[in-house]
Amino acid sequence: GHLSKELITKFNLDADSDPQAYGIGIKELWQVAPGKCKPGLVQHSLGWPLDTSTYGGSFIYHMDKDRVAVGFVCALDYADPEFSPFEAFQQFKHHPSVKPLFEGGEILSGGARTIIEGGAQSLPRVEMPGALLIGDAAGLLNLPKIKGTHQAIRSGTLAANHIAEKSNGEGFDSALRASPIYKELHKVRNIRPGFNKGLWRGLITAGIETVTAGKLPRTLHNHDDFSSLTKIKDLKTIERNWVETDLAPRDRLASVYFAGTDHDEDQPVHLQILEPEVCMTRCTEEYNNPCTRFCPANVYEVVEDEVADAGKRLQINAANCVHCKTCDIKDPYQIINWVTPEGG
Protein backbone atom coordinates (compact mmCIF):
# COMPACT_ATOMS: atom_id res chain seq x y z
CA GLY A 1 0.00 0.00 0.00
CA HIS A 2 0.93 3.64 -0.38
CA LEU A 3 1.26 4.21 3.38
CA SER A 4 3.32 1.03 3.82
CA LYS A 5 5.73 2.20 1.13
CA GLU A 6 6.19 5.56 2.83
CA LEU A 7 6.66 4.05 6.29
CA ILE A 8 9.07 1.36 5.11
CA THR A 9 11.20 4.01 3.41
CA LYS A 10 11.05 6.52 6.28
CA PHE A 11 11.99 4.02 8.98
CA ASN A 12 14.25 1.86 6.78
CA LEU A 13 12.20 -1.18 7.72
CA ASP A 14 13.50 -3.29 4.83
CA ALA A 15 17.19 -2.86 5.65
CA ASP A 16 17.56 -6.52 6.63
CA SER A 17 15.13 -8.12 4.18
CA ASP A 18 15.07 -8.96 0.49
CA PRO A 19 13.29 -6.63 -1.93
CA GLN A 20 9.57 -7.29 -2.02
CA ALA A 21 8.25 -9.33 -4.97
CA TYR A 22 4.92 -8.63 -6.63
CA GLY A 23 2.49 -9.95 -9.20
CA ILE A 24 -0.31 -8.22 -11.02
CA GLY A 25 -3.71 -9.83 -10.67
CA ILE A 26 -6.55 -9.07 -13.07
CA LYS A 27 -10.03 -10.39 -12.32
CA GLU A 28 -13.46 -10.30 -13.97
CA LEU A 29 -16.91 -11.38 -12.80
CA TRP A 30 -19.12 -12.83 -15.54
CA GLN A 31 -22.76 -13.75 -15.93
CA VAL A 32 -22.57 -16.83 -18.13
CA ALA A 33 -25.27 -18.51 -20.16
CA PRO A 34 -27.60 -20.80 -18.15
CA GLY A 35 -26.31 -24.34 -17.76
CA LYS A 36 -22.61 -23.54 -18.17
CA CYS A 37 -21.80 -22.82 -14.54
CA LYS A 38 -20.98 -25.59 -12.05
CA PRO A 39 -21.28 -23.95 -8.60
CA GLY A 40 -18.37 -24.85 -6.36
CA LEU A 41 -16.00 -25.86 -9.15
CA VAL A 42 -12.52 -24.34 -8.76
CA GLN A 43 -10.06 -24.44 -11.65
CA HIS A 44 -6.43 -23.28 -11.56
CA SER A 45 -3.86 -23.14 -14.33
CA LEU A 46 -0.12 -22.51 -14.48
CA GLY A 47 1.93 -21.14 -17.33
CA TRP A 48 0.23 -20.49 -20.67
CA PRO A 49 -0.17 -17.92 -22.13
CA LEU A 50 3.05 -17.00 -20.33
CA ASP A 51 6.39 -18.28 -21.58
CA THR A 52 8.35 -20.65 -19.36
CA SER A 53 10.56 -17.86 -18.00
CA THR A 54 7.60 -15.97 -16.52
CA TYR A 55 5.80 -17.04 -13.34
CA GLY A 56 2.03 -16.88 -13.24
CA GLY A 57 -1.27 -18.60 -13.83
CA SER A 58 -5.02 -18.25 -13.91
CA PHE A 59 -8.14 -19.26 -12.03
CA ILE A 60 -11.82 -19.84 -12.68
CA TYR A 61 -14.28 -19.97 -9.78
CA HIS A 62 -17.81 -21.17 -10.52
CA MET A 63 -20.33 -19.42 -8.25
CA ASP A 64 -24.09 -19.37 -7.83
CA LYS A 65 -26.67 -17.64 -10.07
CA ASP A 66 -24.71 -18.55 -13.22
CA ARG A 67 -21.81 -16.33 -12.22
CA VAL A 68 -18.15 -17.09 -12.81
CA ALA A 69 -15.06 -15.27 -11.52
CA VAL A 70 -12.05 -15.53 -13.81
CA GLY A 71 -8.61 -14.11 -13.17
CA PHE A 72 -4.99 -14.04 -14.17
CA VAL A 73 -1.87 -13.39 -12.10
CA CYS A 74 1.56 -12.63 -13.53
CA ALA A 75 4.76 -12.02 -11.59
CA LEU A 76 6.12 -8.53 -12.17
CA ASP A 77 9.70 -9.71 -12.60
CA TYR A 78 9.02 -10.62 -16.24
CA ALA A 79 11.76 -9.61 -18.68
CA ASP A 80 9.99 -8.66 -21.92
CA PRO A 81 9.32 -4.87 -22.05
CA GLU A 82 6.78 -5.46 -24.84
CA PHE A 83 4.68 -7.80 -22.69
CA SER A 84 1.14 -6.78 -21.68
CA PRO A 85 -0.42 -8.61 -18.70
CA PHE A 86 -3.89 -7.45 -19.76
CA GLU A 87 -3.50 -8.96 -23.23
CA ALA A 88 -2.17 -12.19 -21.73
CA PHE A 89 -5.30 -12.45 -19.57
CA GLN A 90 -7.53 -11.99 -22.60
CA GLN A 91 -5.59 -14.72 -24.41
CA PHE A 92 -6.25 -17.10 -21.53
CA LYS A 93 -9.98 -16.45 -21.86
CA HIS A 94 -9.74 -17.38 -25.54
CA HIS A 95 -8.11 -20.77 -24.98
CA PRO A 96 -10.24 -23.44 -26.70
CA SER A 97 -11.02 -25.09 -23.35
CA VAL A 98 -11.97 -21.78 -21.68
CA LYS A 99 -13.68 -19.59 -24.26
CA PRO A 100 -16.90 -21.67 -24.58
CA LEU A 101 -17.66 -20.94 -20.92
CA PHE A 102 -17.91 -17.21 -21.62
CA GLU A 103 -19.54 -17.24 -25.05
CA GLY A 104 -23.08 -15.95 -24.77
CA GLY A 105 -22.35 -14.34 -21.39
CA GLU A 106 -21.62 -10.82 -20.25
CA ILE A 107 -19.03 -9.25 -18.01
CA LEU A 108 -20.41 -7.69 -14.82
CA SER A 109 -17.34 -6.18 -13.21
CA GLY A 110 -13.58 -6.30 -13.24
CA GLY A 111 -10.46 -4.86 -11.74
CA ALA A 112 -6.75 -5.26 -11.11
CA ARG A 113 -4.32 -4.97 -8.23
CA THR A 114 -0.81 -5.95 -7.34
CA ILE A 115 -0.26 -8.93 -5.07
CA ILE A 116 2.63 -9.28 -2.63
CA GLU A 117 4.57 -12.48 -3.35
CA GLY A 118 7.87 -12.06 -1.49
CA GLY A 119 7.14 -14.18 1.56
CA ALA A 120 9.35 -14.63 4.61
CA GLN A 121 12.63 -13.32 3.20
CA SER A 122 10.99 -10.09 2.01
CA LEU A 123 9.14 -9.44 5.26
CA PRO A 124 10.20 -6.00 6.53
CA ARG A 125 10.48 -5.04 10.16
CA VAL A 126 6.85 -4.65 11.19
CA GLU A 127 7.15 -2.25 14.11
CA MET A 128 8.08 1.43 14.22
CA PRO A 129 7.26 4.43 16.40
CA GLY A 130 3.49 4.85 16.42
CA ALA A 131 2.59 2.13 13.91
CA LEU A 132 2.61 -1.60 13.15
CA LEU A 133 2.41 -3.41 9.82
CA ILE A 134 -0.05 -6.30 9.63
CA GLY A 135 -1.73 -8.38 6.95
CA ASP A 136 -1.06 -7.47 3.36
CA ALA A 137 0.63 -4.23 4.42
CA ALA A 138 3.38 -6.40 5.90
CA GLY A 139 3.36 -8.94 3.06
CA LEU A 140 1.95 -11.99 4.86
CA LEU A 141 0.32 -13.69 1.86
CA ASN A 142 0.95 -17.43 1.61
CA LEU A 143 1.48 -17.50 -2.15
CA PRO A 144 1.53 -21.28 -2.77
CA LYS A 145 -1.85 -21.55 -1.04
CA ILE A 146 -3.08 -18.28 -2.58
CA LYS A 147 -4.35 -17.39 0.89
CA GLY A 148 -3.84 -14.29 2.97
CA THR A 149 -7.08 -13.43 4.76
CA HIS A 150 -6.29 -15.78 7.64
CA GLN A 151 -2.85 -14.18 7.97
CA ALA A 152 -4.43 -10.73 8.12
CA ILE A 153 -6.82 -11.84 10.86
CA ARG A 154 -4.12 -13.59 12.87
CA SER A 155 -1.66 -10.69 12.61
CA GLY A 156 -4.38 -8.19 13.52
CA THR A 157 -5.31 -10.24 16.57
CA LEU A 158 -1.66 -10.58 17.55
CA ALA A 159 -1.15 -6.82 17.20
CA ALA A 160 -4.24 -6.01 19.27
CA ASN A 161 -3.24 -8.38 22.06
CA HIS A 162 0.32 -7.08 22.01
CA ILE A 163 -0.76 -3.45 22.33
CA ALA A 164 -3.29 -4.32 25.04
CA GLU A 165 -0.56 -6.01 27.04
CA LYS A 166 2.37 -3.67 26.37
CA SER A 167 0.51 -0.39 25.69
CA ASN A 168 2.87 0.15 22.74
CA GLY A 169 4.25 -1.67 19.70
CA GLU A 170 7.72 -2.39 21.04
CA GLY A 171 8.61 -6.04 20.57
CA PHE A 172 5.85 -6.76 18.04
CA ASP A 173 8.30 -7.65 15.28
CA SER A 174 9.86 -10.37 17.41
CA ALA A 175 6.43 -11.58 18.50
CA LEU A 176 5.24 -11.94 14.92
CA ARG A 177 8.39 -13.78 13.83
CA ALA A 178 7.97 -16.22 16.72
CA SER A 179 4.33 -16.87 15.86
CA PRO A 180 2.62 -19.40 13.56
CA ILE A 181 2.12 -16.50 11.13
CA TYR A 182 5.82 -16.33 10.29
CA LYS A 183 6.36 -20.07 10.58
CA GLU A 184 3.77 -20.59 7.84
CA LEU A 185 5.66 -18.22 5.54
CA HIS A 186 9.06 -19.70 6.40
CA LYS A 187 7.85 -23.17 5.48
CA VAL A 188 7.13 -22.10 1.88
CA ARG A 189 9.82 -19.40 1.57
CA ASN A 190 11.67 -21.01 -1.35
CA ILE A 191 8.73 -21.82 -3.61
CA ARG A 192 8.22 -18.41 -5.23
CA PRO A 193 11.93 -17.54 -5.78
CA GLY A 194 12.42 -21.07 -7.08
CA PHE A 195 10.66 -19.93 -10.25
CA ASN A 196 13.25 -17.21 -10.90
CA LYS A 197 15.12 -19.75 -13.03
CA GLY A 198 12.06 -20.68 -15.07
CA LEU A 199 8.91 -22.79 -14.88
CA TRP A 200 10.45 -26.27 -14.92
CA ARG A 201 13.11 -25.62 -12.28
CA GLY A 202 10.49 -23.82 -10.26
CA LEU A 203 8.18 -26.82 -10.30
CA ILE A 204 11.03 -29.09 -9.20
CA THR A 205 11.93 -26.70 -6.38
CA ALA A 206 8.29 -26.45 -5.32
CA GLY A 207 8.05 -30.23 -5.16
CA ILE A 208 11.19 -30.56 -3.06
CA GLU A 209 10.16 -27.77 -0.70
CA THR A 210 6.69 -29.25 -0.28
CA VAL A 211 8.00 -32.74 0.49
CA THR A 212 10.60 -31.44 2.95
CA ALA A 213 8.20 -28.86 4.46
CA GLY A 214 10.80 -26.15 3.89
CA LYS A 215 13.32 -27.74 6.24
CA LEU A 216 16.27 -27.69 3.85
CA PRO A 217 19.07 -25.44 5.19
CA ARG A 218 18.84 -22.87 2.43
CA THR A 219 16.90 -19.72 1.60
CA LEU A 220 16.51 -18.50 -1.96
CA HIS A 221 16.34 -14.76 -2.49
CA ASN A 222 14.11 -12.23 -4.22
CA HIS A 223 15.15 -9.31 -6.40
CA ASP A 224 13.61 -5.98 -7.37
CA ASP A 225 10.93 -6.52 -10.00
CA PHE A 226 11.85 -3.31 -11.82
CA SER A 227 15.40 -4.57 -12.41
CA SER A 228 14.36 -7.53 -14.56
CA LEU A 229 13.39 -5.85 -17.85
CA THR A 230 15.54 -6.59 -20.88
CA LYS A 231 16.52 -3.61 -22.99
CA ILE A 232 14.98 -3.46 -26.45
CA LYS A 233 18.35 -3.81 -28.17
CA ASP A 234 18.96 -7.10 -26.34
CA LEU A 235 15.45 -8.46 -26.71
CA LYS A 236 15.02 -11.68 -28.66
CA THR A 237 11.93 -12.02 -30.81
CA ILE A 238 9.22 -13.93 -28.96
CA GLU A 239 6.64 -15.75 -31.07
CA ARG A 240 3.50 -15.73 -28.95
CA ASN A 241 1.03 -16.83 -31.65
CA TRP A 242 -1.77 -15.03 -29.85
CA VAL A 243 -5.22 -15.02 -31.43
CA GLU A 244 -7.64 -12.21 -32.21
CA THR A 245 -9.92 -11.62 -29.22
CA ASP A 246 -13.66 -11.05 -29.39
CA LEU A 247 -14.84 -11.58 -25.80
CA ALA A 248 -15.53 -8.52 -23.65
CA PRO A 249 -13.83 -6.28 -22.78
CA ARG A 250 -12.44 -5.64 -26.25
CA ASP A 251 -9.54 -3.50 -25.00
CA ARG A 252 -8.03 -1.95 -21.89
CA LEU A 253 -10.02 1.26 -22.18
CA ALA A 254 -13.28 -0.69 -22.28
CA SER A 255 -12.23 -2.63 -19.18
CA VAL A 256 -11.94 0.56 -17.11
CA TYR A 257 -15.73 0.94 -17.06
CA PHE A 258 -16.14 -2.40 -15.27
CA ALA A 259 -13.63 -1.49 -12.53
CA GLY A 260 -16.02 1.03 -11.00
CA THR A 261 -13.33 3.57 -10.08
CA ASP A 262 -14.44 7.19 -10.31
CA HIS A 263 -12.24 10.25 -10.71
CA ASP A 264 -13.06 13.82 -11.64
CA GLU A 265 -11.36 14.58 -14.95
CA ASP A 266 -9.87 17.81 -13.57
CA GLN A 267 -8.65 16.49 -10.21
CA PRO A 268 -4.89 16.59 -9.46
CA VAL A 269 -2.99 13.79 -11.19
CA HIS A 270 -2.15 11.16 -8.59
CA LEU A 271 0.48 9.48 -10.76
CA GLN A 272 3.59 11.55 -10.26
CA ILE A 273 6.43 11.37 -12.78
CA LEU A 274 9.48 12.43 -10.77
CA GLU A 275 11.77 12.87 -13.80
CA PRO A 276 9.54 13.59 -16.84
CA GLU A 277 12.50 14.13 -19.15
CA VAL A 278 13.41 10.43 -18.89
CA CYS A 279 10.14 9.23 -20.44
CA MET A 280 10.64 10.27 -24.06
CA THR A 281 14.42 9.94 -24.06
CA ARG A 282 16.07 7.09 -22.15
CA CYS A 283 12.89 5.10 -21.57
CA THR A 284 11.83 5.28 -25.21
CA GLU A 285 15.29 4.29 -26.43
CA GLU A 286 15.99 1.56 -23.89
CA TYR A 287 12.57 0.00 -23.22
CA ASN A 288 10.08 1.54 -25.67
CA ASN A 289 7.97 2.97 -22.84
CA PRO A 290 6.79 -0.25 -21.12
CA CYS A 291 4.31 1.72 -18.99
CA THR A 292 2.06 1.88 -22.05
CA ARG A 293 1.78 -1.91 -21.83
CA PHE A 294 2.17 -3.02 -18.21
CA CYS A 295 -0.66 -0.72 -17.10
CA PRO A 296 -3.94 -2.68 -17.42
CA ALA A 297 -6.03 0.50 -17.74
CA ASN A 298 -4.39 2.49 -20.55
CA VAL A 299 -3.32 5.24 -18.15
CA TYR A 300 -0.02 5.87 -19.93
CA GLU A 301 -0.19 6.81 -23.59
CA VAL A 302 2.41 8.20 -26.02
CA VAL A 303 0.74 10.85 -28.19
CA GLU A 304 1.89 13.11 -31.02
CA ASP A 305 2.84 16.62 -29.92
CA GLU A 306 4.45 19.09 -32.33
CA VAL A 307 5.63 21.27 -29.45
CA ALA A 308 7.49 18.45 -27.67
CA ASP A 309 11.20 18.01 -28.40
CA ALA A 310 10.73 14.44 -29.61
CA GLY A 311 7.49 15.23 -31.44
CA LYS A 312 5.76 13.03 -28.90
CA ARG A 313 4.93 13.18 -25.21
CA LEU A 314 3.72 10.85 -22.50
CA GLN A 315 0.08 11.52 -21.68
CA ILE A 316 -1.26 10.38 -18.31
CA ASN A 317 -4.94 9.45 -18.39
CA ALA A 318 -5.21 9.47 -14.60
CA ALA A 319 -9.01 9.10 -14.65
CA ASN A 320 -8.53 5.59 -16.09
CA CYS A 321 -6.50 4.38 -13.10
CA VAL A 322 -7.86 1.26 -11.38
CA HIS A 323 -5.42 1.64 -8.45
CA CYS A 324 -3.41 -1.53 -9.10
CA LYS A 325 -0.07 0.29 -8.53
CA THR A 326 1.78 -1.80 -11.12
CA CYS A 327 3.42 1.34 -12.51
CA ASP A 328 4.96 2.26 -9.16
CA ILE A 329 6.54 -1.19 -8.95
CA LYS A 330 7.50 -2.12 -12.52
CA ASP A 331 8.82 1.19 -13.87
CA PRO A 332 12.51 0.43 -14.62
CA TYR A 333 13.67 3.89 -13.50
CA GLN A 334 11.49 4.07 -10.38
CA ILE A 335 10.32 7.56 -11.30
CA ILE A 336 6.57 6.86 -11.14
CA ASN A 337 5.13 7.56 -7.71
CA TRP A 338 1.54 6.46 -7.09
CA VAL A 339 -0.13 8.60 -4.44
CA THR A 340 -3.64 8.47 -3.03
CA PRO A 341 -6.10 10.15 -5.43
CA GLU A 342 -8.17 13.13 -4.37
CA GLY A 343 -11.22 11.68 -2.65
CA GLY A 344 -9.49 8.36 -1.94
What are these model-derived regions, one by one?
Residues 1-104, 139, 155-158:
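Predominantly flavin-linked oxidoreductase catalytic cores and closely associated redox partners
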Residues 11-12, 121, 145-159:
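A short alpha/beta connector and helix-capping loop motif
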Residues 15, 144-152, 284, 310, ...:
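Alpha-helix N-cap/helix-initiation motif
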Residues 97, 101, 127-135, 142, ...:
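Structured mid-domain segments that build the active-site/substrate or prosthetic-cofactor binding neighborhood
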Residues 112-143, 254-270, 278-294, 301:
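FAD-binding beta-loop-beta segment adjacent to the flavin cofactor pocket
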Residues 139-145, 157, 161-201, 309-317:
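Active-site-proximal substrate-binding core of FAD-dependent oxidoreductases
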Residues 195-247:
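C-terminal auxiliary extensions adjacent to catalytic cores
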Residues 285-322, 326-344:
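Iron-sulfur cluster-binding cysteine motifs and their immediate structural context
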